[in-house]
Amino acid sequence: MQTSPLLTQLMEALRCLPGVGPKSAQRMAFTLLQRDRSGGMRLAQALTRAMSEIGHCADCRTFTEQEKCNICTNPRRQENGQICVVESPADIHAIEQTGQFSGRYFVLMGHLSPLDGIGPDDIGLDRLEQRLAAEPLKEIILATNPTVEGEATANYIAELCAQYGVDASRIAHGVPVGGELEMVDGTTLSHSLAGRHKMTF
């Protein structure tokens, strides 16, 4: 069936979203064009602004329009002396919803994966090491995902912390092994944070 080139382009663009296949993309495109053109325009404007204006926080690497995010510039968070290391900005959102953590974060934007050529510098561990050396930190909470790669990353960071005399702890495994942190419910995540344990080498 022949379709409008612009419609085809729209459907192909929508497929860049996770979990969106050809049928879902077609349904989304038709819905926007048939029933909600104003919503489609708002979506286009929001996407354009987000893609051009949102960058990474200079300290924690999460998404922000500012040089530093609101969490990193909060004096109370700075005095806390704790940094929670996570794999993605979505993990920060999940932890913040529990209300159980009052420190700052560091976002790896991934995890160590030697088979894929992803080493320490590729996930910002050189920058984390700079913070370990420069800031009076009390504890690094390792909240990487409970996967093989996440555990390897946590162990690497714990060894790094030991070199600088900073305590490293791992969140408890109330989080299901093999799961993604952003998909865990708030109660389970609260128990995981409360039950974290110290990692020693």
Curated annotation (Swiss-Prot):
UniProt record, GO biological process: DNA recombination; DNA repair
C4-type ZnF: 57-72
Keyword DNA damage included in the entry's annotation: yes
SUPFAM superfamilies linked to this entry: Recombination protein RecR (SSF111304)
SS bond partners: none
Pfam families recorded: RecR_C, RecR_HhH, RecR_ZnF, Toprim_4
Annotated Toprim domain residues: 81-176
Keyword Iron: no
Coiled-coil regions, chain positions: none
Family: Belongs to the RecR family.
PANTHER family: RECOMBINATION PROTEIN RECR
Protein name: Recombination protein RecR
Record gene name: recR
